[in-house]
Each structure stands twice: as C-alpha cells, then as structure tokens.
From Swiss-Prot:
It holds the Pfam family LLGL. One of its GO terms (biological process) is axonogenesis. This is Lethal(2) giant larvae protein homolog 1. Associated with nonmuscle myosin II heavy chain. Interacts with PRKCI/aPKC, PARD6B/Par-6 and PARD6A. Interacts with STX4A. Interacts with RAB10 (GDP-bound form); the interaction is direct and promotes RAB10 association with membranes and activation through competition with the Rab inhibitor GDI1. Interacts with DCAF1. PROSITE patterns: WD_REPEATS_1 (PS00678), WD_REPEATS_2 (PS50082). Complements a salt-sensitive yeast mutant (SOP-deleted mutant) and thus can regulate cation homeostasis. Phosphorylated by PRKCI. Belongs to the WD repeat L(2)GL family.
Length: 1036
C-alpha cells in the first residue's frame, strides 16, 4: 500500500511545455578582458580587431556589441594572427606551427565565427611525411602576400608559400637559405648560417615584393614575380623586427642591443653595407632589445617611430614600455604589464602618400590601451569594452536590475567627471566594424565589483559590451602607509627617460585591509553600503556635486557581552578626521567600525527604515544611520564550540569551567541514552534548556585566563560566522500584527529573528521621525543538521517574495499580500525549508542530497517570464552547488523544475564568484579578468547579435571542416556542451520582450562565502529527512 502512496507521479505534459517556455540554459557572452592574451591583429578595411590567447581562444571585436568568439580544437597558444583585409577571414598560427583559417559566416541573419581550413606541418618531415620538404620545421613568422598567398618563415631559415584558398604548399616556390646566400658576399658568410626567419613584411605599393629579415641581421628584398633577390642589406646586429617605409624607399630595423637602423632601398643592386641612420634611443649604456618597431609617415614631415622595449638594462630593464618618437618629442609610455603587441590605425589606401596615423592600440598582458595620436599630448581614448575588470583583484560582486533612469544618469555623470583633466581625447573609439543588431535594452542593469584596493566599480551590464561607468574609492577616508611612499617615489622620479604612466591596471594593493567584501545599493534612494576586510562599514550617498564634509564614525563592539577576549589580527583602519574633500559621486556619510576588526561576511541595507545590518565571524550588529546610533550587537561565538577552540579562534578556558562542562555533557548523554523516544515537547524543552544554558551569564563570569582571538577567514567551518542578513515586514509576534523584522543566519545553522520598533514616517515624508529604533529577539531557530544558513527570504500570502524597500510604496511592484499567512524560506547548504509564520512550523522542504559531496553555494529568487505570454511569469529559486550544477525550484512548493551543468566542479573560484540576477541570468569568473554570462530564462537572454558589411562568399574555403560549436568558455573549458545557437526570427526578440513592471519582486538574498569544492554525485531527494528544528520563542 505504501508504494502506491509514495509513488512518483508521471510528468505533466502541460507543465513540461510550460517549462520550455520559461527555462532555457545558454552561456551567452564573456565580459571583460581576455585572459593571457598572446596575439593581436587588425583589419583596417573592416575596422575589426582580433585577440588570441594562450588557451587557443580567438576573439574578434568591432563596434560595441559586435563580438565573435572561437576556440581552437587543440589547446595551444595563438602566436600570430593575420586578417585577410576586407574578407572577414583570419589566419592564426599556433605554437605547434599549425595554421588555421577562420571565417565570419552569415547564417539566419546573424554572423558567426567558424574555423575552416587548417595546415599541420609534421614535426619530422623526412620521417613522418615524405611529401613535405625537409626544411619545413617550426614556423616562426607568417605573412599574407598579395592577398592570396601565405608566406611561412621557419626556424631553419627556409621560406615556404601556401595557397590561402586551400592552405596547400605551392610547388617549386620554396626559398632556401642557400639560394639567399648566393647573393651575399663571401666575407659576410663566414661559414655561418643565416639563422631563423625573424620577420616578413609585404610592400604596400608592390605586393609581389617581400622583405625578409634573418636572425643574424641579414635583410633581403625578394621578388615573387621574378623569383629572385632584388636587394641585400648586410646587417650585423641580431634582428628583432622590420618595417617598410610608406613609399618603400626606406626600411627600418630594430635589434637586440636596443638600437634601430634606417636603410635606403635606392642605393642600387649591390649589397648595402651600412644603414643611413643608426641610433640607440636610450644608450650609451646596454639596453634591452627593441621587440617591434613601426614607422608611420605624416604630411607635416614629422614622422612617427613607435617601438616597444629598448630600455636601459640596468636601470629600467623591468619596465614595460612603448616609446613614441616624433621629431624632437619622445614619450615613454610606462605600463604595469607586459607588452604583447601593438598597431596603428592609419590610412592604408595605396593612393595616399602618407600614413597619417590616428590612433595607437597597445595590447598588454592585462589590458588594452588606445591613444589618440592626433590630439596634443596623445591622450587615452576611453574604451567602451575590454576594460580590465581585474585592474585590482575582484573580491566581491553584486548585480542591480531595473535601475531607474534618473539614478543611471547621475552615475554616468559622476563617472564622466572622473575623466582626467584636460578632458580625454576627442577621437571616438577607432574599432567600429560591424553592426549591432540587438535593440536597445528596455531596462538597465548594473554590475558592481568590489576590489582589493578599496574601490567599487560600476559597470553597464545591460548589453553585450560591459562598459565602465564609475569608480568609487574608499581609500581616501583612511590613513595608510602608502601615502608617504607614493610622495617619496614621485619626488625621486627622474626626468629621463620621460616616463608617462598609462593604463589602469594596478596589481598592487595599498593596504590589504582596504579590500571590499560586501556591497549593497538602494536604487531608489541612491544610498549604498560598502563593507571591508578590516570590519569597516561605510554608508554612502550619491551627490552630483563635489563637497567637503566630515564623516561620522561609530564603533560597534560585537563582543560586548564577552569579557577577556584579545584580538590578535590586523589593526583597524584609522580614518582621517576633520573636513575632507569628496568628488561628485557616492560620498561617505557614516563609518561604522566593527570590533574586533574582522572581515565583514554579510551586509544588508533598508533605506526606508534607515537601517543597516552587518555581520562578521564574531557576530552581527544593527545600526541606525539616521540617528547615528547602534541598535543591536549580538555575539554569535559559542563557548562550547570545539571548532572555535581548535581553529584560528583560540581561547584558553579555566580547568574549573572545563570540568563543569564535561560533567554536564556526561549527564546529558546519560539522560538521552535512557530516553530513546522522547516526545516532541520534551525535545523542545531540552533544546530551550540548552539554549538558555549557552546564554546563561554565570558561565561567563569565572574566566581567570584571558581568551585570545586570532584572525580567520570567512570561509572556514567556525560556527560564529554570520552568513546572511535580511530585513522583512512580516508577522513575527502574532498572526494579526505585522511589523519590521531582521533575520540573521550563521554557519552553525542558527537563525535569529528580531522584531524591530521603527518609527513610522509621516504621510508623504521620506524620512522617519528622529526616535530610537528598538530590537527585541523574537525567534531563535536551530536547524538540526546544523548546516550553514545560506539565505533567508520571507514569502507573502500568495507565496511571493516581499518587494524591495520603496518598490510597493512607489507603485513599482505589486504590493505584498498581508492578509494571508506569511512563510519564511531558509536555505542552508544541505536543504531548503519553508516555515509558517509566526509559529515557525515546518511547511515544506527539499533536501538537496542524501549523500556527502553536494552543498549549496549560491541562492537567489528570480522571476522567469514566458516567451509565449508577456503577462505570465513565475518566481523561482535558483541554486548553484559546489559541483557547478544549477537547480531551479518552484516557490513556495520547492518542486524541482530544471537542472543544468553550468561550471566545472574543479573551478572553485568560478563557483564562489557566481552572481544571479533577478531576471534569471548570472555571472561568474572564468578567469581573474573575465565574467562568463549565462541565462536560465528562455525569454531574457543577452547575447551578441551582429553582422559584418562584407560580401559573403558562396563557397568559401571548401572543403570545410566540421563546424565549430558555440564557445562555452574561451579559457579552455571543453567539457560543457551547450545547446546550438539560433538566430531565427527578429534578433530583438530575446531583448525587447520583458515581463510587465508589476511583477513578483525579488527578495534580497545574501551571497555565501567561498568554500572548497568536494566531489560526489548529486542526488535529489525529498524524502527521508526526519530532522527536527528547535525553535525558541522569545515573544510569547
């Protein structure tokens, strides 16, 4: 009989169809700067740029929103990239000497990047494949000549030619070193080889001429038309780079000793022995090699010479520089990361006599910098994308959806005022190829990232291009040691070389205590809370004009009811006193300092009540920032916690107290052993007795030995860590009167619910009266399995989460149902459970797994709108586990809806950094500099929809290899397979359709701390959980 009672019901076809209309998993776009870039290319005709990485990724960028991404099948480093100008095709060279031809193909109204042909030379041609010539070894350099020929320079000094249409070797056109040596005088040979081919350059006016540079220093002009050597330049210095002059009458070469030379090609056919100009810009002392050099002509006659490297080896050998020389002006662009490559945006039309460069683009290991070469001072051009997310290491992130247009405009205005003076370049972004087919988003989304240097950056996450808007810095409020070091460094800086700091990547943090741990933003009042590593909690407010004011400071001792503790960790940050100047933007109004100054692990803001709650590893506090007074401080450390004794939080207890607690444990174990099946009431009484005993003051009186607290991270298993905080207007005292409440969840499975007495605001007033806020402990819930509480949310009478502050009062969301019974959803690392309020009795639950290994890491309530009906939407619970799986559950029934594999379980940092949005999307870090964006919603999808204005070939590069799948992760993750991409119908369908404004609101759920991933199989189980929650009611 029981098997029929518990038999699972069959799938409802109607519900399954509805699921397909609500849920769909896509990895859509990668935001940020490519991780570990290794190659760069630019198409001057289409105005698109390509970046290759060490993991084999290929990323092509055009105008904002125009992006194409591909991944080589072999995880090898991309060493060189070359566009076929105007054709939408890209040739890549990997470090295994293989060539790959990529094409941008039009399909279903959208453009896609696909890999076409490939060429793999054998590692040992004489043994592996007799059809390949013996000299075809490692490829060192590639050139596209005359548009239809690929020229390969090799390590052996041989040069080979391939047909670009088939990537097949052209017979009888190989140029061997012996043939070149015949044109070289005998005294130059000296029995030595020419060395590898270092550079191949095509002539702009005559594509049949190829400039060849060998490592030993020999330069050769080879005529492909006549198959002969036209000119020889006998260089003696080891060659690094070559560049033609505009008209082809001059050649510039750079060398390993930090010098460059200019050679004239008008000296006739005999070998040229000496260059016309030889100079070492930073000599006479030994210098590093000039890795790459460019010569760009101007109509004014003052030509540009741009090169990387060449710095004095002893003094500045560790600098990463690109030097720009024009006439008598020399500027040394000083970067904080290694220079990968650079190019200029200039005229390439054959009829133009001069280059007239407009911009210089420098690809660095950690960022992309574009300089305006037409404006005096050569200022930087603001980048609409590819901004380095990791300019300082990311420590936390948050997403804010549906940002009001007024707040958006104020944030953008504050960001524009942060531009350096004089104003930035008037030149617009020069990489403008392609067309973005996606419509303008109907709502604005902000991505907030907290960083190690104490900054919070605001990003426009509304579309494909993640655009920087504004940067908030908190370091100016505090006294740090770096202030004196910076002034000293500026004082001793020499005038030569003329260094100029460029770029925003700064890997060094001034003070690790400045690191941002949590952020919270109220989008209706423009108030913000920022919490840091040293226990600092800042309350800020957006101002449109600069101001000068003092910041109020208040200390909140979270251990005020525990005597004899000594903090052995870092000191708190000392704030500056007196009037301080603040730029336009978010300006601090209140500084709350937690004591001990441990890292803040949870924070929440309720602007309507002017309250902020914060938690650390020692407890949590509630602060009224309107009256600038603390309301509550609660310590969550348990004296009997063995983990707290053994972990970094070490406390020495007296022998008398230890013996007393040991006898109590023995007595409790005897009682529990005799009574195997106690009644529920006796269990509750015993639990209450234990709770009363833990909080009994007489246990804390006799402490003859001082207890010492050491710093510890927020991701350990100590029970006192506060994991989440939550405000709600709900029923806690009784079922007829609702009011403000605050909820706190800890690492030990404890949930504290406080009833708040908040003075009500007058009719039409924004601020509440200046009366004190009171907090009374109402409920205390101890989960039996003691798993860490990840998130808490209150559901109204219709089972929907409560709206955010000001949402209902301003008619921006449907008012909550305050007539029916409320419920509270408590999400722990092991299970989800819904309790009725105010009795706090279990209503429904879902146990994520019955086995060890699967734990909840991130939780959020999101609204999923139907693709078929604009009026239908469901609020569901999205959950990410430590195995990288995403589960979606119905609310409040907690029935599983869909399950997707999202992140590799080995990617611990990616799982820890995941952030869900309120419309069913998410972000997580796939590298220190890149966010992967994914969507769980079938309606709300943000992905590249773009095209290129080129003539699409009917049968391009046939035969074609297997079509490349849509890239899931360009950092080399290959074990996650996505559904095929589709662009059928209007490209705006995924962006323009949104649910109505009156939609179920999202409850603010706190993020969880980082934890280590464990292996294990996921098992979804809704039965077999017989745990009992202990509830203590303090309100009666």
């Amino acid at each position: 009989m029981m098997k029929f009672r518990f038999r699972r019901q069959g799938a409802d076809p109607q519900r399954e169809k509805l699921k397909q209309e609500l849920f769909a998993f896509h990895k859509t776009v990668e935001h940020g700067f490519p991780n570990q870039p290794s190659a760069l290319a630019f198409d001057p005709e289409l105005r698109i740029m390509a970046i290759g990485t060490r993991s084999g990724a290929v990323k092509i960028y055009g105008a904002p929103g125009v992006e194409f991404t591909g991944l080589h099948r072999d995880a090898a480093t991309v060493t060189q990239m070359h566009f076929l100008p105007g054709q939408g095709r890209l040739l890549t060279l990997l470090d295994d000497s293989s060539l790959h031809l990529w094409e941008i193909i039009q399909r279903n109204g959208c453009a896609h990047l696909e890999e076409g042909l490939s060429f793999h030379p054998p590692s040992r041609p004489s043994f592996d494949n007799a059809s390949f010539p013996a000299g075809l070894t490692r490829v060192t350099v590639v050139l596209l000549a005359a548009g239809d020929t690929v020229v390969l320079g090799t390590e052996s000094g041989s040069i080979f030619f391939l047909d670009v249409a088939t990537l097949a070797l052209l017979e009888g056109q190989t140029l061997s070193p012996d043939e070149v040596l015949r044109s070289v005088p005998d005294d130059y040979r000296c029995g030595k080889a020419l060395g590898p081919v270092e550079s191949l350059q095509g002539h702009l006016q005559d594509p049949s001429k190829i400039l060849i540079g060998y490592s030993r220093g020999l330069l050769v002009i080879w005529s492909q038309a006549t198959q002969s050597v036209e000119h020889v330049f006998l260089g003696n210095q080891q060659l690094e780079s070559l560049c033609w002059g505009r008209g082809g009458s001059n050649i510039i070469s750079s060398h390993s000793d930090g010098s460059y030379a200019i050679w004239s090609t008008d000296t006739g056919s005999p070998p040229t022995l000496q260059p016309t100009v030889v100079t070492t810009p930073y000599g006479p002392f030994p210098c590093k090699a000039i890795n790459k050099i460019l010569w760009r002509s101007c109509e004014s006659g003052d030509h540009f010479i741009i090169f990387s490297g060449g710095m004095p080896r002893a003094s500045y050998g560790d600098r990463h520089c690109v030097c720009v020389l024009r006439a008598e002006t020399l500027v040394t662009l000083d970067f904080t990361s290694r220079v990968i490559d650079f190019f200029t945006v200039h005229s390439t039309q054959p009829e133009d006599e001069c280059d007239n460069p407009q911009a210089l683009a420098v690809l660095l290991e950690e960022e992309l910098v574009v300089l305006d070469l037409q404006t005096p001072g050569w200022p930087a051009v603001p980048a609409p994308y590819l901004a380095p997310l990791h300019s300082s290491a990311i420590t936390c992130s948050a997403h804010v959806a549906n940002v009001p247009s007024k707040l958006w405009a104020r944030i953008v205005s504050a960001g524009e005022q942060q531009s350096p003076q004089p104003a930035s370049s008037a030149l617009s972004w020069p990489i403008t190829g392609g067309r973005n087919l996606a419509q303008e988003p109907s709502q604005r989304g902000l991505l907030l990232t907290g960083h190690e240097d104490g900054t919070v950056r605001f990003w426009d996450a509304s579309g494909v291009a993640l655009r920087p808007l504004y940067k908030l810095s908190t370091a100016g409020l505090f006294q740090t040691d770096c202030e004196h070091a910076d002034s000293l460094a500026q004082a001793v800086e020499d005038d030569w070389p003329p260094f100029r700091k460029v770029g925003c990547f700064d890997p060094y943090s001034d003070d690790p205590r400045l690191g941002i741990q949590k952020v919270a933003l109220c989008k209706y009042t423009a108030q913000m809370v920022v919490a840091g590593t040293a226990g600092q909690v800042l309350v800020l407010e957006l101002s449109e004009v600069p101001a000068e004011h003092a910041v109020s400071v208040a200390n909140v001792d979270l251990l005020q009811d525990r005597e004899g503790f000594t903090w052995k960790g870092h000191e708190r940050l000392n704030p500056h006193t007196g009037l301080l100047p603040w730029p336009a933007g978010f300006q601090p109004r209140m500084l709350i300092q937690c004591l001990p100054p441990a890292a803040v692990t949870a924070v929440t803001l309720h602007a309507e009540w002017s309250l902020v709650a914060f938690g650390t590893s020692h407890g949590f506090g509630l602060f009224d920032y309107q009256r600038k007074s603390p309301v509550l401080a609660r310590c969550t450390l348990h004296p009997n916690d063995s983990l707290a004794m053994e972990g970094p939080l070490s406390r020495v207890k007296s022998l008398k107290k230890s013996l007393r607690q040991s006898f109590r444990r023995i007595r409790k174990s005897r009682v529990s052993g005799k009574k195997r099946t106690p009644a529920a009431s006796s269990k509750l009484q015993e639990a209450n007795a234990q709770l009363a005993e833990q909080t009994c003051p007489h246990d804390l009186e006799m402490t003859p030995v001082q207890r010492r607290i050491e710093p510890r991270s927020a991701d350990d298993s100590l029970s006192g860590v506060v994991r989440c905080l939550y405000f709600a207007d709900t029923f806690l005292r009784d079922a007829t009167h609702h009011g403000p409440t605050m909820w706190a969840g800890t690492n030990s499975g404890s949930v504290f619910a406080y009833a708040l007495e908040v003075p009500a605001a007058t009719a039409g007033g924004e601020k509440r009266p200046e009366q004190a806020v009171e907090a009374v402990l109402g409920k205390e819930v101890q989960l039996m399995h003691r798993a860490p509480v990840v998130a808490i949310a209150v559901l109204d009478g219709r089972g929907r989460p409560l709206p955010e502050p000001y949402e209902a009062s301003r008619d921006l969301a449907q008012a909550p149902d305050m007539q029916g019974g409320h419920a509270v959803l408590i999400a722990s690392e092991e299970q989800f459970k819904v309790f009725t309020l105010p009795k706090v009795s279990a209503k429904t639950k879902f146990k994520l797994t019955a086995h060890e290994g699967c734990r909840v890491r991130k939780v959020a309530l999101a609204t999923f709108a139907s693709v078929m009906s604009e009026d239908y939407a469901e609020t569901c619970l999205a959950c990410l586990t430590n195995l990288g799986d995403v589960h979606v559950f119905a609310v409040p029934g907690l029935r599983p809806q869909v399950h997707y594999s999202c992140i590799r379980k080995e990617d611990i940092s990616g799982i820890a950094s995941c952030v869900f949005t309120r419309h069913g999307q998410g972000f997580y870090l796939i590298s220190p500099s890149e966010f992967e964006r994914f969507s769980l919603s079938a309606r709300n999808i943000t992905e590249p929809l773009c095209s290129l204005d080129i003539s699409w070939p009917q049968n391009a590069t046939q035969p074609r290899l297997q079509e490349s799948p849509k890239l899931s992760q360009a950092n080399g993750t290959r074990d996650i397979i996505l559904a095929p991409e589709s662009c059928e119908g209007s490209p705006s369908s995924a962006h323009s359709k949104r649910a109505d404004t009156m939609e179920p609101p999202e409850a603010a759920l706190s993020p969880v701390s980082i934890d280590s991933a464990a292996s294990g199989d996921t098992m979804l189980d809704t039965t077999g959980d017989v745990t009992v929650e202990y509830v203590k009611d303090f309100l009666g």
